[in-house]
Regions:
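C-terminal accessory "lid"/substrate-recognition subdomains
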Residues: 5-6, 35
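ATP-dependent carboxylate-amine ligase
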Residues: 12-177
Length: 177
């Protein structure tokens, strides 16, 4: 599991179990079987060249900062590639800030669509890009992910942020695969 928050959660859970009188040896043996919640700093795959692909729900400035700081702590990673977008009909003030955060903690930033809902996707991306003007803009999320994966080199790390394990896009009143 990746991230300090995961450690904090495990320590808190183990402490509660011990306080309830559970066998501490059994608790510590079971730690090796823990898995993160789907879509929360979830390692999707490791490529042949040892690049990692991680997905996370990070859709707020604080969550994106936390995810990227956690990723920076992974030893032996060359570059961090971050792919994300911001949802439509939501807090517009966070878009530029999230672009700035991605720009600060990433070597490559790719901005794409993420549930534009009833807003013009190009406007959402434009607001994000105002915080990371050197980012690559690829509206279609599938194409953006394929592009990001094609950029992976040995020991790189790709963070696909914002949607966690969701496999749909909310566009207007439709939910598309």
């Amino acid at each position: 599991m990746i991230g300090k928050f995961q450690v904090y959660n495990v320590v808190a859970s183990a402490s509660i179990c011990i306080a309830l009188g559970m066998d501490s040896n059994l608790i510590f043996k079971s730690l090796g079987y823990l898995k993160p919640a789907r879509g929360r700093m979830e390692v999707l795959s490791e490529t042949k060249n040892k690049a990692l692909v991680i997905i996370d729900y990070a859709h707020t400035p604080a969550a994106l900062t936390s995810a990227l700081k956690s990723i920076q702590e992974i030893i032996g990673r060359e570059r961090i590639i971050t792919l994300f977008g911001c949802g439509g009909d939501r807090d517009k003030n966070k878009r530029k800030i999230m672009g700035e955060i991605a720009n600060e903690y990433s070597d490559i930033v790719i901005v794409t669509d993420d549930n534009p809902r009833n807003e013009a996707p190009s406007n959402i991306r434009s607001e994000i890009l105002s915080g990371c003007p050197t980012a690559t803009e690829i509206p279609n999320r599938d194409k953006a992910i394929k592009y990001a994966v094609s950029k992976l080199q040995k020991n790189d790390l790709l963070l696909i942020a914002g949607k966690g394990h969701e496999t749909f896009q909310a566009v207007g009143i439709e939910t598309l695969p």
